[in-house]
């Protein structure tokens, strides 16, 4: 699932990071890849009376670096786009504009994106993975095994959403990884939510370092009490 409040703060602080002075500087684009809503949040180890929050923003990010472009997370299934609120089993999903269209608005075609890294392989992070045909997937070894060798053992994995990545080139990681070799974009291993959950450190030229923390936490309370 998607952590919400921490990501919302990042959006306020970061937005689309573009340096007006240097065309080749590192840029981070924040994209809206859907929304989830819940009638019962106890599945997140938080009781319903501990917070009034019931909706979660689903973000995707595009990192534009002089050495390549990295899509971080792929949001909800684009089949939801234009369908309004879809409700099932106490959860609703809404998705208004596909990540592919948002990437095009930034100035890239989906087939120009050359790297993809997903915080983890749950359905709300892999929805559009099949629509970026030329990416090299950067994935932790444990997550790769769970997603491609035993997806039926992981009920929130939806293999159909990322099956086209099976034959894509991959970099199988066993821990942290410097994506572009300059320390500016670092994948950090953070297992727990899934076997190979990972987070992304980005050091932006104007606003400095931040962490895109995937589903490390879902609520402020989760972070404060380490739930």
Which residue stretches match the model-derived regions?
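Active-site flanking residues adjacent to catalytic metal/cofactor-binding acidic residues
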Residues: 72, 119, 139-140, 192, ...
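Active-site environment of divalent metal-dependent phosphoester hydrolases
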Residues: 37-39, 79, 121-127, 145-146, ...
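Bacterial N-terminal signal peptides
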Residues: 4-13
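Short, conserved loop/helix-junction motifs that constitute active-site signature segments
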Residues: 130-133
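Metallo-beta-lactamase
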Residues: 13-124, 136, 140-191, 207-214, ...
